[in-house]
Every structure is written in structure tokens, then in C-alpha cells.
């Protein structure tokens, strides 16, 4: 039997002890997720703050190093807005929503693939050549169809905006099997009702793209980085932050949530309904939020789980 002695520790020893406790807490979660696929939506402040960018890259490399199969799907809203302003690209708004014209689409494509994706790949590959940047256009990775946006009962044409209708899972799985980390920009080729390419490219929301990819792969977990701490029962009361919820409880809860919380809650529920074991919204403003969510018992945001999740 080992006795724990009450020995006073200096600052260095205390810090070392805390680090060892973190590693011990992580061990069962490392074993649980080893060999499993985790899809991460990269967005919010984590994309624009250099310190948070590096922390996110560190987290992804750590996940891969312990045998997890991460996939990153990234947005780029702040960078796209900055480039549109800098290039003086004409932008039209309908009912407060930005229309993706062909001119805007060119900026979206350039920023997501050539800027945001490349920067993240470079940060990850500073450790080892692990990450491969790509878009939905590459090798038929994603197929999309134009979105139907309804505002106040009226259908609004938002231009070149789409929803994912198909994922080339064989391509993604082959990359994961080779030890690669796919870093995906969700610009995707449009297909018609018969699945034939139209020659047009659509801008797809990163949240919905990440959810579609996680569903297609039946991922173990989907994690979405945002600029909020999670889902609140009563926004913005911090005491009502929901740490964990079953799919059935979340389904019953959604009609009672505030308008700002409902889309986030619905995104988690959609992932679970599509076969993902658990889905979480975490605060991307916290350094290493991804590791805290995956490798600690309490996590750091709101996790929704299937009703039979163990």
C-alpha cells in the first residue's frame, strides 16, 4: 500500500505535480479515443489570434501523436470580411445576410484555400509533415447543392451558397490511414439533382460542412470551436451553462432556449441524429480548449451525447 504524505511542496514541485495529475486524468480518454475519428470545426477567435492559432495547432498535433484521427474543417469569416473590404469587392445584403456573388465567391475561395488553410497547415507541419490542406473541390471530396434560405416565410436567393449532399469518405479514410491530417476548406462543387457537376462552386458554412463530414464518417466526436462558452439554458446567465446533455433531453430543451442558442443546440443534435457519438461546442477563446474538451472528465463546453453513449 502506498501512503500519500502531507509534504509541503515548493512552487516548482507543485507545478510538476499538477502536470502529472493532468496527464493521469487524460489517460482513460486517450485510450477511449485512440484510433477513433474526431472532426473539429476551427473558427471564431481561435482563427485570428496568433497565440490561439498556435495553441490549436499544438492540440491537433497532440491528438494525432496519441493515435487519434483528427480532421479539421475551417471557416474564415473575419479574414473574408477583411479581404472583401481591402479589395473593395461589391457586396449585396438581403434581409441582413450577405449574398455570395461570383465576385465574392472568388474572394472566399482565395482566402479559405490560399490563406487560412495554408497558415494552419504550416503551423501543424512545423512539428512534422502531417497536415494536408484541401478543399471540397479536390478529388470530389465534397458535393453541394444550393441552399434554400427562408426568411419570414419568403425564399431568399443568397447566391452561391450551398449545403453538403455527399462526402467522398474513401478519400478521407485513405488519408487518415496514411497518418495524414485533412485540413478542409468547405468550398464545394455544385451538383444537380442527378449528382452531375454543374461547373459551379458553392460556399458552404463550415459548421454544416463539419457536421456532414462527421456524419458521413460516423465520427466518434465532433467539436466546434466558437466564441461562446457553450449552450446556456438562460442566455447570458453563466450559471445556466449546460455541461452535458443527452440527445433526447436536448431535443426537448431546444424550443425553450433563446434564439441565439437554438442554432448551436440544433447543430449538436443534427450531428448526434446523424450517427456521431458525441458533439460539443467549446470556447475557442480559451487556449487549448480542444485538449480540455477531449482529455478531461468535465470538458470545457457543452457536450451532447447519444442516448446510449457510455
UniProtKB/Swiss-Prot annotation:
Gene3D superfamilies to which the protein is assigned, alphabetical: Acetylglutamate kinase-like (3.40.1160.10)
GO cellular component: cytoplasm
InterPro entries in the cross-refs: AceGlu_kinase-like_sf, AcgluKinase_fam, ArgB, Asp/Glu/Uridylate_kinase, Glu/AcGlu_kinase, NAGK-C
Pathway: Amino-acid biosynthesis; L-arginine biosynthesis; N(2)-acetyl-L-ornithine from L-glutamate: step 2/4
Protein keywords: Amino-acid biosynthesis, Arginine biosynthesis, ATP-binding, Cytoplasm, Kinase, Nucleotide-binding, Transferase
Ranges in coiled-coil conformation: none
Pfam families: AA_kinase (PF00696)
Function comment: Catalyzes the ATP-dependent phosphorylation of N-acetyl-L-glutamate.
Family: Belongs to the acetylglutamate kinase family. ArgB subfamily.
HAMAP family referenced in this protein's UniProt entry, alphabetically: ArgB
Name recorded for this polypeptide: Acetylglutamate kinase
Amino acid at each position: 500500500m502506498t501512503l500519500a504524505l502531507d509534504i509541503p511542496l515548493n512552487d516548482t514541485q507543485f507545478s510538476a505535480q499538477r502536470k502529472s495529475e493532468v496527464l493521469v486524468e487524460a489517460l482513460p480518454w486517450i485510450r477511449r479515443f485512440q484510433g477513433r475519428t474526431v472532426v473539429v470545426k476551427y473558427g471564431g477567435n481561435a482563427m485570428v489570434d496568433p497565440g490561439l492559432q498556435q495553441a490549436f495547432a499544438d492540440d491537433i498535433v497532440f491528438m494525432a501523436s496519441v493515435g487519434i484521427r483528427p480532421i479539421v474543417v475551417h471557416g474564415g469569416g473575419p479574414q473574408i470580411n477583411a479581404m472583401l473590404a481591402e479589395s473593395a469587392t461589391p457586396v449585396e445584403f438581403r434581409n441582413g445576410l450577405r449574398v455570395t456573388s461570383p465576385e465574392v465567391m472568388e474572394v472566399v475561395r482565395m482566402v479559405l484555400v490560399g490563406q487560412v488553410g495554408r497558415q494552419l497547415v504550416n503551423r501543424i507541419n512545423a512539428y512534422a509533415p502531417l497536415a494536408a490542406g484541401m478543399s471540397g473541390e479536390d478529388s470530389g471530396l465534397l458535393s453541394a447543392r444550393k441552399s434554400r434560405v427562408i426568411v419570414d416565410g419568403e425564399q431568399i436567393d443568397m447566391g452561391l451558397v450551398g449545403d453538403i449532399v455527399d462526402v467522398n469518405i474513401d478519400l478521407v479514410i485513405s488519408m487518415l490511414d496514411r497518418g495524414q491530417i485533412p485540413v478542409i476548406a468547405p468550398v464545394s462543387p455544385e451538383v444537380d439533382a442527378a449528382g452531375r457537376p454543374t461547373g459551379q462552386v458553392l460556399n458552404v458554412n463550415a459548421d454544416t460542412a463539419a457536421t456532414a463530414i462527421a456524419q458521413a464518417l460516423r465520427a466518434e466526436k465532433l467539436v466546434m470551436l466558437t466564441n461562446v462558452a457553450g449552450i446556456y439554458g438562460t442566455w447570458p446567465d453563466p450559471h445556466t451553462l449546460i455541461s452535458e446533455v443527452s440527445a433526447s433531453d436536448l431535443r426537448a430543451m431546444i424550443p425553450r432556449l433563446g434564439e441565439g442558442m437554438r442554432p448551436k443546440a440544433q447543430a449538436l443534435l443534427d450531428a448526434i441524429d446523424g450517427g456521431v457519438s458525441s458533439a460539443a461546442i467549446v470556447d475557442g477563446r480559451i487556449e487549448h480548449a480542444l485538449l480540455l474538451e477531449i482529455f478531461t472528465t468535465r470538458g470545457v463546453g457543452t457536450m451532447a451525447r447519444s442516448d446510449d453513449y457510455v
